[in-house]
């Protein structure tokens, strides 16, 4: 499974580790992803999504029904 938030589309980005002597080596910054179950009242079932912390805040703000509609409009099967 790829490390991509299903709500925001956040994915890993690359950057540098910087030591005290300012020597740089490549590294990845991973999004803060979690598997989370959301109750969908309209479908009378749970939906399991891989979401970032920001994705959870968006769901709290907009509601799971509207967020699911957006995800499905993008062609993702949920």
Swiss-Prot record:
Superkingdom of the source species: Bacteria
Assigned keywords, A-Z:
Ribonucleoprotein, Ribosomal protein
Q: Name one GO molecular function term.
A: structural constituent of ribosome
One Gene Ontology cellular component: cytosolic large ribosomal subunit
Q: Does the keyword Iron apply?
A: no
Give positions of region: Disordered: 1-23
Q: Does the keyword Magnesium apply?
A: no
Q: Which InterPro entries match?
A: Ribosomal_bL28, Ribosomal_bL28/bL31-like_sf, Ribosomal_bL28_bact-type, Ribosomal_bL28_sf
Q: Which GO terms describe its biological process?
A: translation
Record-linked PANTHER family: 39S RIBOSOMAL PROTEIN L28, MITOCHONDRIAL, LARGE RIBOSOMAL SUBUNIT PROTEIN BL28M
Q: Which family does it belong to?
A: Belongs to the bacterial ribosomal protein bL28 family.
Name of this chain's protein: Large ribosomal subunit protein bL28
Q: Which organism is it from?
A: Marinomonas sp. (strain MWYL1)
| Lineage per the UniProt record | Bacteria, Pseudomonadati, Pseudomonadota, Gammaproteobacteria, Oceanospirillales
């Amino acid at each position: 499974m790829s490390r991509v938030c299903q709500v925001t589309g956040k994915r890993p980005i690359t950057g540098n580790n910087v030591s005290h002597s300012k020597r740089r080596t490549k590294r990845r910054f991973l999004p803060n992803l979690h598997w989370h179950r959301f109750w969908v009242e309209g479908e009378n079932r749970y939906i399991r999504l891989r979401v970032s912390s920001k994705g959870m805040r968006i769901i709290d703000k907009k509601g799971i029904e509207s967020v699911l509609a957006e995800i499905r409009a993008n062609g993702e099967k949920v």
